[in-house]
């Protein structure tokens, strides 16, 4: 087993334990919010989704912040990320979520998420994480492919193509993390690609027949991957910032 695999396995185990720690509320709240949103998507219970989905990122943010020891700037950047992601959730949720085919609403949601990505990327850079050539190249190909697919649907998709490029850049930076950021930051190598997968599933969901079993399964898959990615990116970046500050 490689050193990276060992660090990643340990960091993921710690994340799971934090979710099941009943001595503090944020882990169980994160699980409840995620499971409630999955149930809402599977059963089309919009009121349940409106109750649960906006709590996913704030719970993940609380998990990321609870160990303290962050510089004020990093705390502000992490909070800005959480605010951007939550705003994006609400914008998309009020527009019928992943089933929405309105480019205008998708662009508005992407703008909110994009602001969160920029804040998180700035925090990663402050923690000393730098792009590595292989990761940047792989994600560059992914960004180019996604942009081509989106632009093939019309020039109105240009903002979404720009968002795809931004997310790919964030994932490239996250997967460039190394041992200098500390063992707990290893989850970033998973968080970035999982966020990419979540957004790719949204594109696939937009082409699924409304009300079909495949559409519902994709909706649940989007929530699964999004919640996991948000948790790993927020907590992993916070861990990297703490380690760098303590070094």
Predicted features and spans:
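Short amphipathic, positively biased membrane-proximal segments
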Residues: 1-247
